[in-house]
Amino acid sequence: MKTVLQKDIVETFKKLNDTLSSFSEEEINTVPFQGSWTPGQVVQHIILGNSGYPELFEGKTKATIRKYDEHVKELESIFLNFNTKMDAPDFLKPEMKNYNKNSLTLALLKIESDLLKASENYDLTLTCLDFQVPGFENFTIYEWINFALVHSQRHTHQLQKISHYITTL
């Protein structure tokens, strides 16, 4: 379980970092079309949504009385359905400002490192009690890491579409 999860973490963040590196410093802060976030804002949203996991995993947990990965397929079906538009909750909406590509890259590397360490050092079957995604019961550590992955994959896809749009302007 841990080896496969760690491979998924590395692959997800490699694709995300490769996509981010394809943007110039100027393109990072370019609004591709009306109503869209800039690539920098998309990455900042990923950072906001995928930060704080070590603290969550260190918080209150309990033994899980269901399958530890019960919600993974549902999360995949929601987040990897690219035909569905979602609205971020206010606390995950990125500020409209100029973002620095290097700072974003460093923040993503820290998140990748945090997730890899968590996947190695924690009992992934424990249920976290300190935070809950609306509409779901409390997630296990395994499900939280998968949430971070499908969230990142969704927005990597969004960044690839923005890149295509910007380069064809």
Range-by-range predicted roles:
Residues 1-4, 169:
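Basic/polar N-terminal segments that are highly enriched at the extreme N-terminus
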Residues 29-79, 121-169:
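Short, contiguous alpha-helical
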Residues 75-126:
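Acidic/histidine-rich alpha-helical segments that form the ligand environment
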